[in-house]
């Protein structure tokens, strides 16, 4: 039987997943699954188990499960530390390495985690738009605001000048709150609710813009200005030559 790696990109809205071989080749198209991020712990664990089994090809045996997971998270020990960020609150304090080992039957050391923005950064530095970057800032805006910092093709080491702890600035002070409350899906929904009278996510807002809605365009422009303001302190501190979003 073919040995495969089950790889998941875990977001707050959806989870993208696919099986890969030892060379990193996709063995099937990437599939999209609902994250169910607001569900209870048992439902969430069952959802992950269903995804594991759904993406494993017939006549194949999984030898490792690799997950890009949003932080805060104890990646070394596999413990979820997300709380109060509108996603996966029910998993707070849960040892997901142990839980996924029990679900899949794999040894705990065969369950690996990495920060989702860090995974994005590594991919861009190895294969994408940051292959020639000396200093790169990576930002992933979704359910929250994920971030990572790269130096000469590697993730910036802890303590690198201009890099916040763990490479996170979602919790940095911004206006009357923090970055994550503004540069996120809920931030965009709040802004569109104030400007348009109805909360809209990025896709719905883009559809209105495509239809010629000038108020929706102004809302997106305002969100972009907020993003620029939120990034400015990070850019001034780190001085990147490349910004990937």
Can you describe what each PLM-predicted range is?
Residues 9, 66-70, 114, 138-144, ...:
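Short beta-strand segments
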Residues 78-93:
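A charged helix-plus-loop insertion that forms the helical arch/lid used to bind
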Residues 31-32, 85, 160:
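Short clusters of small/polar residues that mark proteolytic maturation junctions
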Residues 34-36, 88, 163-165:
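A short acidic/small-residue loop/turn micro-motif
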């Amino acid at each position: 039987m073919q040995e495969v790696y089950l790889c998941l990109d875990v977001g707050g809205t959806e989870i993208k997943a696919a099986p890969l071989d030892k060379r990193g080749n996709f063995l099937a198209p990437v599939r999209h699954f609902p994250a169910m991020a607001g569900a209870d712990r048992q439902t969430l664990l069952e959802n992950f188990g269903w995804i594991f089994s759904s993406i494993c090809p017939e006549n194949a045996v999984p030898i490792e499960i690799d997950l890009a997971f949003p932080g805060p998270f104890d990646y070394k020990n596999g413990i979820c530390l997300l709380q109060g960020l509108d996603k996966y609150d029910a998993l707070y304090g849960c040892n997901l390495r142990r839980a996924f080992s029990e679900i899949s039957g794999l040894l705990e050391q065969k369950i690996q985690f990495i920060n989702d923005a860090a995974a994005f950064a590594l991919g861009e530095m190895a294969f994408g738009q940051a292959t020639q970057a000396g200093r790169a800032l990576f930002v992933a805006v979704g359910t929250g605001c994920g971030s990572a910092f790269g130096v000469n093709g590697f993730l910036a080491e802890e303590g690198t000048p201009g890099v916040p702890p763990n490479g996170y600035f979602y919790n940095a002070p911004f206006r009357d709150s923090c970055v994550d409350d503004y540069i996120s899906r809920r931030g965009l929904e709040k802004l569109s609710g104030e400007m348009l009278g109805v909360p809209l996510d990025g896709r719905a807002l883009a559809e209105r813009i495509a239809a010629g809605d000038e108020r929706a365009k102004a809302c997106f422009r305002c969100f972009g200005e907020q993003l620029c303001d939120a990034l400015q302190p990070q850019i001034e501190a780190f001085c990147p030559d490349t910004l990937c979003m």
